[in-house]
Amino acid sequence: MHRNYISRLVVLLFLLLPLPMLAQEIVLKGRVSDPKGNALPGASIQIVSHAVSGNDRILGKATSGPDGLFVIKLDFPGNVNLTADAPGFRPVTRAISLRRGTNPQIEISMNELSPRLDSVSVTADVNELNVLTPDPAMRVFVRQDLLDANPGRPGAPVSIPGYPIETASSGIKAPQYFAPGVAGDHGEPIAQYIAVGAYLLPNNLSANAHGNGYSDPNIFIPEILESVQVDGGAFNVREGNHSVNLAATYGLRSHLDPFLTITGDYRDLDLVAGWSPSPDSFLAFEASYGNGFLDRLEHRQQYKFNAQRIFHVGEHRLTLFGIGYFGRSYVPGLVPIFAEDKNDNDYPNLGDTTDPRQKDQTHTALVAFNDVWQLSQSQQLQLSGFFRTYNLSLFSNFGSDLGLIRQSEFRTAAGGSANYVNKVAEYFSLLGGFDYEREAPRRDDLDSYGFLNRSDPGYYGPFTPVDGNNITIGSYTPYIAAEGALARYFRYYLGWRRDEINIDNEDLVTTPQNPNDSFQKWVSVNSPKATFSFLPKESWYLPLISLSFGQSFFTEDPRTGMGQGTGAGTPVAPGSPVATSHSYQLVASRTVRNTDFKVTLGHVTSSAELGKIDPDTGAQFDLGPSRLRFMTVAVRRNFRQGSLLATFSKADARDFDSGQPTPEAPRTIFDLLGTAQRLPWRLQARGEFEYVGTKPLGAGCEPNPNAECTGTPVKEFRGAVVRPFMNERLTAGINFLIASGYTGQTTESFYPQTVIQEAVGVRIPSYASVTLTYRFGRTSAP
């Protein structure tokens, strides 16, 4: 009996032994952040268990606190889904595996804004800036509130308010963004990036055959873009070559609902399809055909492929991104703006072009990755890289003594980046990193085909090699920055980057008039950055004020000896391979009665450029030191079912030596953007009016060749009206552009051996097109 009692007691103890383990609760901690990495309070978190029967069960709930943190305690381990939902963002769902005890902290980034969101950020809340995005002049534009710049046609994917986009021809030739007082015709002082995860992937092409710093926005399918961020360019250590006057960063969506879009008019047809194979991925394809709206038919073909996949592996968030693009077309070119000019008596009317032989062919392939490793709640390590191929063959006639020219190249570009972020405390965040980039244009050629034979306008004839180069530009860049609160009402940002640049130029064409100009040179560039901000109390009725300083640079085109100096008749000596600038910026912003106001004042001084290469003619000229002053005022008002954004800029850019205005730099820019989400008959509308004032174009025009040539102002009103049908499964829309003026305005000499210049540009046609979008799968109620 006694032995029986003991045996039962042993069995009972054995059965009770696992109970402490069973009683050990499961603790899941996490943090929710916005697209900038800032804490996102008020997000709703749910842990959902999926049963085979289809009856889902909510196991736990939590709400993120002011610091974005949340804690959920559960009873049972297993594979579940975590869902995060925050106002203004698309819900995020992630499959996780729970184990007993404390699980690794979950980092949730709400990267994709809700399609219902109707906000355009024009004021910089200094409290939201961080060590990765420190510029108080930064503006983030939500894709849903922007208009396609040219729906179904080539060019920039979106129109950015206050930053006109122009090109000196039509067709697939890549347009470039302009900034107040900046003649950024070929992207030289304006940087363009693609946000692959948290990696800033450069889209500029240094020493491009057509123009130094050339960037091609044609590679994007507009539907994959979530946002566009613009900043001053010179005030962030992460932004390097070509980030002088402006940096524009395209943000990508995390997924696409399955769709098919057809856009067309009486001359063009565009088809786009996209879907998401998994919640954190997308595939998109586009095919575009057409002739444009100018008299010279384009015979355009474009094919695009954009794809992205995001993986969550433990504490890693890995983003893979790829692009494939091919395009070709004829490119209607510059024509005289003022037809009454007597020099136009012999001008051949060839249909919106001076030379029907002008054409362009471009193809590129790109792969990139970004790995964000969350070491702890406050520490993060990023590893990134990319590889790209690019080809260009562009035939242009800009009226030089060379006539029709061909600018061609094939290049490879590759790069890598590593950076470490540690937010030690509110008063100190540390960023340290290293970037590497190598661009290798091969057969960077300039050839001449001579002048147009009017009796046989399709004849090209033999070409004459003018110049050819093999170029390698490599940079090794360490950088460091610190950011935080100095006191209750002040914040600071201090940064430094040092670029060690290796430039290797192999001259492939040597003649007595064009001696061999091969060289190899190392150049070191230091770029300090600093921003100090004042954050008053709301009750003080004072604006947020920030003062910034930054030094920036762009690498010069290393090709030299390509032409003669202007007027002197002797070759121009090679200049410095790097041009530097010093920028100062004052930003004041405040919100009054739900209306955001921002004023930005800027002052930029730039070094002289000797032997600068004209991207249109291949000729060399000296460009003296310059000074730019500008003021931009932005006002935004959000309404319940819409928004208004007005931007006005005045600028004055001049050559220090001569005091003359910088040719082709816009001095006045006005932009008004409006959206309306709910109109009668369930219509939705967006409209934008843009005005670019008369620009100085240089000297040489009649009747006084010594006076400043001027062009004409440009006025554009673009709009889109859409209506959903079939429970938002089908959307029909009309896009239109009402325009007057000429884009790409410059001066040109049409005939050889003449010094008289004429104001020329590309006529901007008005048009309308129809868009139909069909969405597959489940749809949400309106």
Give, region by region, the residue ranges found by the protein language model.
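Short strand-turn segments of transmembrane beta-barrel domains in outer membranes
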Residues: 218, 227-276, 287, 293-295
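Short acidic/polar hinge/loop motifs at secondary-structure boundaries
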Residues: 198-232, 250-251
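Transmembrane beta-barrel wall of Gram-negative outer-membrane proteins
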Residues: 261-289, 294-334, 357-380, 424, ...
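C-terminal beta-signal and adjacent terminal beta-strands/loops
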Residues: 696-698, 723-782
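Membrane-embedded beta-barrel scaffold of Gram-negative outer-membrane proteins
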Residues: 380-396, 533-555, 575-632, 636-649
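N-terminal periplasmic "start-of-domain" segments of outer-membrane beta-barrel proteins
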Residues: 50-61, 120-153, 175-176, 204, ...
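Extracytoplasmic beta-strand/coil segments of soluble accessory domains associated
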Residues: 156-202, 233
